[in-house]
From Swiss-Prot:
HAMAP family: HisE. Keywords: Amino-acid biosynthesis, ATP-binding, Cytoplasm, Histidine biosynthesis, Hydrolase, Nucleotide-binding. It comes from the Bacteria. GO terms for cellular component: cytoplasm. CDD domains: NTP-PPase_HisIE_like. This is Phosphoribosyl-ATP pyrophosphatase. The keyword Phosphoprotein does not apply. Pfam families: PRA-PH. Belongs to the PRA-PH family. It comes from Bacillus cereus (strain ZK / E33L). GO terms for molecular function: ATP binding; phosphoribosyl-ATP diphosphatase activity. SUPFAM superfamilies: all-alpha NTP pyrophosphatases. Its EC number is 3.6.1.31.
Length: 107
């Protein structure tokens, strides 16, 4: 059974391979990687604002926007979703020690 992420990614790849006029996804592909990256940055900022405002409904919507634009980037770079899924699966359940990671600077 395909999940929502798989279906979304398949739709994005379909738009890339068979462009539809007036498609926002095709607009992003036509503008290229810089535009896609800019949109990811904008959407990440909106996630931060929604979280700081304690607006969980808006936070969910903005997180979906981030994921969508990240999926567009993956398609642009010809990285299959299965590569991401495999990486998540590999990391799942691994014990990570705080000392193994860089220090997080406070704001």
């Amino acid at each position: 059974m395909r999940n929502a992420f798989t279906l979304l990614f398949e739709t994005i790849e379909e738009r890339k391979n068979n462009p539809l006029p007036q498609s926002y996804t095709n607009y992003l592909f036509s503008k290229g990687e810089d535009k896609i990256l800019k949109k990811i940055g904008e959407e990440c900022s909106e996630v931060i604002i929604a979280s700081k405002n304690n607006d969980n409904e808006e936070l969910v919507k903005e997180m979906v926007d981030v994921l969508y634009h990240c999926f567009v980037l993956l398609a642009e770079k010809n990285i299959p979703l299965k590569d991401i899924m495999e990486e998540v699966t590999e990391r799942n359940g691994k014990l990570s020690r705080v000392g193994d990671r860089r220090e997080i600077d406070t704001l």
